[in-house]
Amino acid sequence: MKRSVIFVLLIFCALPVLCSQTSAPPKRHISCRFTQIWNIPSCYNKQSDLSEAWLYAIISVMVFCSTIFALAIYPYLDIGWNAIDAMNHPTFPVPAVIPLQQVIAPINQPRPPSPTPTEISYFNLTGGDD
């Protein structure tokens, strides 16, 4: 995988050098002056001597190579969804919660007595003074 990345980088570095040696700079655009804005559309409407097929081929190769290069280096990047703990981060900021200190009863303090059950008189059950 590393060899293919190095090969693609070498192609990107060598491509401008090879193209500059084989083709001459376009001389027709030398007369296009950016200070004369009214002449720019007529100056750049001329037909190019380079075929459109070459332009599409070069753009397609560059898009393909940049896609392969991006896919090759993506696992080594530690950003975005590729981060180590990306799925553990909350999507919204967590509200600040102040922890309250719990009241701890002393160890040697006796517990409060349990509530006594209600008292029912025998006389109240029978309905009189028998």
UniProtKB/Swiss-Prot annotation:
Keyword Glycoprotein: yes
Record PTM text: Phosphorylated on serine. O-glycosylated, but not N-glycosylated.
Segments crossing the lipid bilayer: 53-77
Full protein name: Early 3 receptor internalization and degradation beta protein
Organism this protein belongs to: Human adenovirus C serotype 2 (HAdV-2)
Keyword Cytoplasm listed: no
Protein family per UniProt: Belongs to the adenoviridae E3_RID-beta family.
Gene Ontology terms describing biological process: regulation of signal transduction
